Amino acid sequence: MFKSFLIKYAEIGVKGKNRYLFEDALVQQIKYALRRCEGEFSIRKTKGRIYIDAETDFDYDEAIDNLKTVFGISGICPMIYVEDEGFEKLCGTIVDYMKNLYGEQNMTFKVMARRARKNYPLDTMEINRELGGVILEALPNMKVDVHNPQIELNVEIREKIYIYSETIPGPGGMPVGTGGKAMLLLSGGIDSPVAGYMISKRGVKIDAVYFHAPPYTSERAKQKVIDLARLVSRYSGPIYLHIINFTDIQLAIYEKCPHEELTIIMRRYMMKIAETIANETECLGLITGESIGQVASQTMHSLAATNEVCTLPVYRPCIGMDKQEIVKISEDINTYETSILPYEDCCTIFVAKHPVTKPNLAVIKRHEKNLEDVIDGLMETALNTKETVIVRCDETGNTTM
């Protein structure tokens, strides 16, 4: 039935003279999402509105599902449109529309006309009144309620006449790419994909780095992270995923540093490597999935020790959330089932039985001096041998690299 969509946005609408930049970015993200759908679509931006018209047959549910992944969209209005062939023809179209959607239900409605074409022979109030009367005559179970109707029937008089009565909630946020770029430390767990999703919602384009530790972590663990990146890319757009072989660095830390400090020291070197790649790729910050107090390495003292090695800001979108809240989002974005697959990542091996929760930074730095003779070479090797893949959802939803 529906041949078109009106795209509503919220935050973009309060922008000033640069609003067109945000609108253009939103159009590009809509195009990216619709490439995953069967059918051809045209997108028009006119007078503060974005319209999507189907040029061929398409799967309605598939289109809605993909549009719901586009940050910046606050609402999706499925529409029909007709050529302006006179008011009598419009009345018949309106009656058919109401019958098809609502049948003989006892419901209240109001008509909300909008004339972008001021030369239309009826004014807004006349359109509202005449169409309301036609609906009442054709559907006697309907009643008018101008204050709190169950149905708001919108009729827009433009070059064509657009009709819609439903607004499907979008994800909100800002279009990806309008908020700069940052580097996500992506593990195989639940939290970091959620962090990537949440920062993308604020318009930030993400790259990602994954620390692989063969043979202690398997190729299945690596593939799991690629799959998580693919799932996040439905929302974020294509992700450059940098895969670092971290094994030799981990072994050196294990051999030369106190075991209760393994996790903190390991994470400090992860942050150093991630920041190096971030600077090379013009990222403006790092992103992690940490939440205060969730594990020993995420106490305030531990986070301060981790931050100390960075000059770039570290963004932690999950910082004030409990695990249940993070899990709920991971379920909503379909990363949860992949995250809980039982493949270990490098953060789960060489774990101390009693990790320090209040690390002393001076002590940590003193113990890191045990690595001075090897660590620079190990880090250089890890960076020089990194593997970079581009992960995206293609038209079939598969991973492409």
What are these regions (language model features)?
Residues 229-255, 343-345:
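A conserved beta-strand->alpha-helix junction
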Residues 334-342:
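A short alpha-helix-loop-beta-strand transition element characteristic
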Residues 292-294, 342-350:
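Small/polar glycine-rich anion-binding or flexible loop at a beta-alpha turn
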Residues 1-183, 193-239, 308, 356-361, ...:
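RNA-binding accessory domains that recognize and position tRNA/RNA substrates
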Residues 189:
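Conserved G/P- and acidic residue-centered "switch" motifs that form tight phosphate/ATP-binding loops
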Residues 133-135, 172-179, 250-251, 255-328, ...:
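Active-site adenylate/phosphate-handling loop in enzymes that bind or generate adenylated species
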Residues 184, 208-210, 243, 288, ...:
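Structural beta-sheet core signal
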